[in-house]
């Protein structure tokens, strides 16, 4: 079967419609939200606080919100800039709640991309060859104040796996060690190693500082991939879709 990922992407009027910029409003129950989320980023990264979210005439209550990112959080945060990236979980407290068919929103502040175009253009190119997160731009308002323009990127999670692969039991890792840009360190559960796919030994614990696991399991699979890459590259095709990886790198 010829791979045709286009059938999975939003059309006009969908959450990731890129024909125009819509605005998303987030109203936190606690006006002290920025201090709470800024502190918890380092001490309790999974902590979410409730907010009401309004987008394109749709209002959702009890949405779980936390800050996200590593470098794109640390750099503005340490400068006292409130334009940090957000992660919104629609069904954190209300089971099955979604926004236009999606249960998670990831709002990137494009801190390292003044053009706001890199992720959008990459998504448009990659989607022709492999499963790719959808991307568009939204204006974010928090507590009634305009926070700025954000890159709205589809979350690579179980819903994404179901959408493109028809199953959701795969292994997911975020290859970005926090602490590299954070003077405080420790954000998002890591201490700032580099995810270089370098073999560090058979003990999975030696990889904790460099990779953040996003699935229910997978450390052994990660070490197996890295070990095969170093010691048995001729067997790599058995555990890695080399063709799609090359398309992504190209």
Where are these regions (language model features)?
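Phosphate/dinucleotide-binding and metal-coordinating scaffold of catalytic cores
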Residues: 1-250
